[in-house]
From Swiss-Prot:
PANTHER family the UniProt entry points to: 5'-ADENYLYLSULFATE REDUCTASE-LIKE 4-RELATED (PTHR46854:SF1)
Glycosylated residue positions: N143, N190
GO cellular component term, pick one: membrane
Gene coding for it: APRL4
Name this protein carries in UniProt: 5'-adenylylsulfate reductase-like 4
Location of the protein in the cell: Membrane
Pfam families, per database record: Thioredoxin
Length: 310
């Protein structure tokens, strides 16, 4: 009798535990305020201990700055997604404006990849250099082990081929791709050269001073230090140059004086020669007059002698 009662109690306990497991309701954890605002929480949760294999979907491009860039890197490191697409662009760059529609379309075609658009004015040049961004626009695909940079044209087919080669994810079928939003293409589509714009602080140093103050001060310090090191050499070179200039000036002045003296000597010689020529002419004239006077006197005396003898 006691054995039967004990067996009955064991059966009742087993049925109670089974009923509790059967009525256990699966649920998902509630989203925090951060996840609701950022929208970075996984869109799936485990139900009855089974984890869904479906990845979250990202249907739009997220505009961000350095904080969002760090969030994108955290998504990679925490395995929230396999790849992250980063577009570095500038509002003043015409190539960025023409590339942005293609980026919006590719984000809808690859909705499993989060797409971030980082504006040039909201990020430091040192961060751009860290990611190898030397012009705009620049598109990067990142995962936990590699970083691929897009170097093709702005055409949608080229972007799809790049995404497929890097991620291995196939996009929509050809019909869906043709029905997608049309993307305007500016310029020559046959041109396969990448088009980008340089940095703004490369064109205007005041932007660099405003955005990278410490870098600008470091450059100024290096230049002043270099000037301090080469200052003695500059002084010696300047003294040598001044001596050469003064010596040349003295030689030029001496040459000018010599030429002046020679010109004066030539003028004096010419003047003396003209005086001698004038004196010679005067002497000849005087001699001719003297001879004429003597001849006249001789003729008159001979006439007188002849008259007296008669």
């Amino acid at each position: 009798m006691e054995k039967e009662i004990l067996l009955l109690l064991l059966v009742i306990m087993f049925l109670t535990v089974a009923d509790v497991d059967a009525v256990r309701v699966p649920f998902c954890a509630t989203k925090s305020a951060k996840d609701s605002i950022f929208g970075l929480r996984d869109q799936t949760c485990s139900v009855s201990g089974v984890e869904s294999d479906e990845r979250p979907r990202f249907v739009a491009v997220t505009e961000g700055d350095e904080r969002w860039l760090q969030i994108a890197l955290d998504m990679i490191h925490k395995n929230k997604c396999d790849y992250v697409a980063l577009l570095f662009y500038a509002s003043w760059c015409p190539f960025s404006r023409s590339f942005r529609p293609s980026f919006d379309v590719i984000s809808s075609l690859y909705s499993s990849i989060p797409h971030f658009a980082i504006k040039e004015s909201s990020i430091k040049p040192s961060t751009l250099s860290k990611y190898g961004v030397h012009g705009f626009p620049t598109l990067l695909l990142l995962n936990s082990t590699m970083r691929a940079r897009y170097r093709g044209t702005r055409m949608l087919d080229s972007l799809v081929a790049f995404y497929s080669d890097v991620t291995g994810i196939e996009t929509l079928d050809k019909t869906s791709l043709e029905r997608s939003v049309s993307v305007p293409h500016l310029g020559n589509e046959n041109n396969t050269e990448p088009e980008n714009c340089p940095f703004t602080w490369a064109r205007s140093p005041e932007n660099m001073l405003r955005q990278e103050t410490y870098l600008a001060l470091a450059i100024v310090f290096v230049l002043l230090r270099l000037l301090h090191l080469i200052y003695p050499t500059l002084v010696v070179f300047m003294k040598f140059t001044w001596r050469r200039i003064a010596q040349n000036m003295r030689l030029e002045s001496l040459l000018e004086h010599t030429v002046g003296f020679l010109s004066r000597a030539v003028q004096l010689c010419m003047h003396r020669r003209s005086n001698l020529q004038g004196g010679a002419m005067n002497a000849r004239a005087w001699a001719s007059k003297s001879l004429a006077t003597v001849s006249i006197g001789d003729s008159s005396s001979s006439n007188r002698r002849s008259s007296s003898s008669q």
